[in-house]
Amino acid sequence: MEFGFFKGLPHTGSNENFSDYKKFNNSISKENVISHIRSLEAGLTSEPSIELFTGEKIRAGIYDDGDFVFPYEFLHYYANYDIGIPYEYENYLKSIGVGQEKKGTEN
């Protein structure tokens, strides 16, 4: 599943509305999601992307996480703006333990 390809990004098929991502109300904390995404290996391009709201140049590329593909730039927007992640991706993250507190363990 692809997500986060907002209109204005330099990727083929970038046709999603940024504002749609404001509707996601996720139960996993942003800190946990950001930490997980930062742990992924990114495929970066040499061409920059232009930040949709400030016009500054930012890195461009792609993240591939299981069955999910999203632009490298998504992390910038997720970390800096009030948006969420699709519920399908959130469910996947939960299934691999992201944001799931470990209950007391036996020694």
Language model features by range: what are they?
Residues 1-107:
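Alpha-helical interaction/linker modules in multidomain eukaryotic proteins
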